[in-house]
């Protein structure tokens, strides 16, 4: 699976225990996402576009409206990309 460098960095943070938090406006539309590392730092590479690509490929998912976490498919994509480098 082809995964861009930005997506790999976001997946790497999620694999280490990070989370993606979503922010919505008063109409319920997604306006901003924030990728937070386990230490509490915010990753600037995680844009709305990168988030949508990861979600579309089912590399991340949310359970019961919680923060987005990496899925098994995301872990496989992360491990598979490290073998090719």
Curated annotation (Swiss-Prot):
The lineage of its organism: Bacteria, Pseudomonadati, Myxococcota, Myxococcia, Myxococcales. It comes from the Bacteria. This is UPF0386 protein MXAN_1729. It comes from Myxococcus xanthus (strain DK1622). InterPro entries: YjhX_toxin. Belongs to the UPF0386 family.
């Amino acid at each position: 699976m082809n995964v861009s460098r930005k997506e790999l960095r976001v997946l790497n943070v999620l694999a280490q225990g990070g989370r993606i938090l979503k922010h919505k406006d008063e109409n319920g539309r997604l306006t901003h996402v924030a990728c937070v590392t386990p230490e509490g730092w915010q990753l600037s590479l995680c844009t709305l576009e990168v988030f949508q690509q990861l979600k579309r490929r089912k590399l991340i998912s949310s359970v019961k409206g919680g923060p987005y976490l990496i899925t098994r498919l995301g872990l496989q994509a992360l491990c598979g990309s490290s073998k090719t480098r």
